[in-house]
Amino acid sequence: MLSAGTEATECALKLMREQGIKKGKRRGIIVCIEGNWHGRTLGAQMMSWNPDQKNWIGYHDPNILHIPFPYPWDTVAMEDPKQFFKNGIENLCHEFNLDPSKDLCGFMLETFQGWGAVFYPSEFVQELSEYAKENDILVTFDEMQSGFGRTGKLFGYMHYGVEPDLLCCGKGASSGFPLALVLGSAEVLDLPNIGSMSSTHSANPIVCAAGRANLECLFDDGLIEASRELGVIFHNKLEDIRCRFSEHLSCVQGRGLLAALIFIDKNGNPLASLCDAISELCMQRGLLVVHTGRESIKLAPPLSISEDAMLEGLSVLENSIADCISMNKS
């Protein structure tokens, strides 16, 4: 138990490498995914992708590498997600002269890409999982944004039909208190020496009580089921909104009570400034949405929300989109 999500992903980085040392691996290669994000501390930023956010780092760990993400708008990736993974990992191993069974220690995956709620095709993740088993490589899911019911399942990785070795959790683990977790088998979690994987305020009584209360609410109040059931209504309404504004709103991504609206015009131009305007107008009208700084707006209503309140919020969103598009035209 730790205090921040970035501590948890760094913990997983250390655990994967310690397991590699135990297994006699030659190098501590961690394979991450392009476009993913894992935190703001040094190791977490190097596992993340955005090069512009890493230009302050003087030394880039040569044993943290990346393979391409299978975006749903990438026709090559969608034609054969399994082969897309194979091509990515084979190209990586060829470029850096790697033997996967001797050099690769771990895969780090964000369960979905946070900026756009973009999930992997299940076949991609399943092929990655099989590859990891064949080569004695640990698989870690970064569940900071997807865990604890957000996607209609307890953990987001459950949509893929695989079993990871490690889970990094936060945010929804305590609903606002500074609690992060790394979950896994005792074989892996017990690798570090006692005291080498601690944090000043980790596992303090207040956040542990909050985490327990959070779990009780999730299960006793049926919030995971509510996320799944309300999520159907949520996404149906968002699809109606997408159809209405199809010249500006290209697609809606997400599952459960999680969605991202991707604003790209018919010519393929990202509409980040339109997202700015919509987010601002929504806020003025009492609805908080997340503008990611890109061409997307994220929605993540409380798991305890009522259907009426959710539909009211979506009505505010729809009207705000309409008004901003109208203002842009004028």
Give the ranges of each region predicted by the language model.
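Conserved N-terminal phosphate-binding loop of PLP-dependent enzymes in the Aspartate aminotransferase
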Residues: 1-330
